[in-house]
């Protein structure tokens, strides 16, 4: 598998996680919507599914790991940043085969693509603190 397939899976997953967070829809419905309505050419679909399902099922545990490293309440983190750090938190905690530098760099790129101007700095700082715990 090409690394770009995983990058595309992360990109799609962060959008699906964002949608799931805001809609509160069943994660299976969100997954189905994204698989059927988005362009999934070149996407590692199995990895996309794992990321979405993993974050949905473990988000409370991931949030608890992130909270001590925040400079604000978790509820005050923007939905986009929340989706990104939850995805990265999942990879850092539950996917030991993914090097931490890769998980952090991918999250930074997602923040640059989807977040506000300084989102990538927030994401980088938070995840760096998480891996140093």
UniProtKB/Swiss-Prot annotation:
Taxon lineage: Bacteria, Pseudomonadati, Pseudomonadota, Gammaproteobacteria, Alteromonadales
Gene name of the record: nusB
Name of the protein in question: Transcription antitermination protein NusB
Native species: Shewanella denitrificans (strain OS217 / ATCC BAA-1090 / DSM 15013)
Any matching Pfam family: NusB
Family: Belongs to the NusB family.
Gene Ontology cellular component list: cytosol
NCBIfam families, A to Z: nusB (TIGR01951)
This protein's UniProt keywords: RNA-binding, Transcription, Transcription antitermination, Transcription regulation
GO molecular function: RNA binding
